[in-house]
Every structure is written in C-alpha cells, then in structure tokens.
Design a protein with these regions (language model features):
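Residue-level preference for short coil/turn positions at secondary-structure junctions
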Residues: 9-11, 44, 129
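Thiol/selenol-based redox catalytic cores and closely related redox-interacting motifs
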Residues: 69-152
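Short active-site neighborhood of thiol/selenol oxidoreductases, capturing the structured segment around
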Residues: 6-36, 48
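A short, polar/charged loop-to-alpha-helix boundary motif
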Residues: 151-166
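A short loop-to-beta-strand scaffold at the N-terminal edge of the catalytic core in hydrolase folds
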Residues: 1-5
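Short beta-strand/turn micro-motifs composed of small residues
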Residues: 19, 52, 137
C-alpha cells in the first residue's frame, strides 16, 4: 500500500478499479472475489490496482491481506483525472440493494468469524462514490472502461479476463497497410 504503483505498467495490462471508502462492504466483497482468483488474473498478464477515496492508514485494516496494489486517494485526484463520480444513486438505485444486503451480511460474518473490523460509521470521502473500471495498455491507452451506475455495478473477474483476452487479440491482429 505504501509502495510505488506504476500505471501504466510497461510489462502488463493494468486493471485500474475505483472503489468507494475503506471498509465499504460492497467494495470489500468485490475485492475478495478478485483476491480469490488472483492467480488467474496474474496468469492472464494483468496487474490489479484498486483505488479508494480513503487514506492508506484508513485502508490498512481492511485491505492489508489483499494480494494486489491498493492505493489511497483521499483528495480524489485520480477520481477527478478519470472522471469517476459520486452520486446518491450509488445507494438509492434499487439494482444495488441486493448487493448491499449480501455484502453487509458477508461483512457481519467476517466480523464475527474472522475478527475483521466493522465498516466506519462516518467514512472518509463519504458513502456515495460510484465504481469504475479501466483496462490500461502498457503504452497508457485505455483499452476498455466502465463507469458503474450504482455501488454494486462493476466488472467481475470473468468480465476482466474476457476484456483482457479481447484486447490482446485486437492488438495481435495485423494492421492493414492500405
């Protein structure tokens, strides 16, 4: 978390994902799915980077065991650079509600069974952040992006692997010299 993270990475595609706040139940459940399949992500030649609008100190208790880079951006500079928004629809969109309930139950289970910390009651940066995903080439081009419409609207690992494969196939196709 306190290391330098290169984006773009000269040797790999980068999946740059923007999450909400440290301890966000929806974000943490989502990131756990990426951690569980991290070997597949690495084998696909991807570097995983998750950005939160919280400080590194606030993130540590929730993300220290993740096998990929987590970046704190409490000033939301990267959010502004990539046009990632905050809006009430993050929580008010009915499509988010099932994911919110599922992630809160998962968080409570982790608190009881694994001693994980509770989410903050007043999170740094607020609760209304929207997720976003970017697939970035080694030359810095954005190959694919997705701006979530609510808190639980983001790429899955399967989406990411499919997009990375498609990007590689597109790059590998011979260019016409007409």
């Amino acid at each position: 978390m306190d290391q330098v993270v290169l984006v773009p990475d000269p040797e790999r595609l980068v999946h740059l994902q923007f999450r909400r706040f440290a301890g966000c139940p929806v974000c943490n459940l989502h990131l756990r799915s990426f951690a569980q399949r991290y070997d597949e992500i690495e084998a696909a030649g991807l570097r995983e980077v998750a950005v939160f609008h919280s400080s590194n100190a606030a993130l540590r208790p929730y993300t220290a065991d993740l096998p990929f880079a987590v970046v704190g951006d409490p000033e939301k500079r990267l959010y502004a650079e990539f046009a990632v928004e905050s809006a009430p629809r993050a929580l008010l969109d009915p499509r988010a509600w099932l994911g919110i309930v599922r992630s809160v139950l998962h968080t409570m289970w982790g608190m009881v069974r694994e001693g994980r910390p509770a989410p903050p009651t007043d999170p740094e940066g607020g609760r209304l952040g929207l997720p976003a995903d970017f697939l970035i080439a080694s030359d810095g081009r954005v190959l694919a992006c997705y701006y979530g419409e609510h808190a639980d609207d983001q790429w899955s690992v399967d989406d990411l692997l499919r997009l990375a494969q498609s990007a590689r196939e597109t790059v590998a196709e011979p260019q016409s010299t007409a």
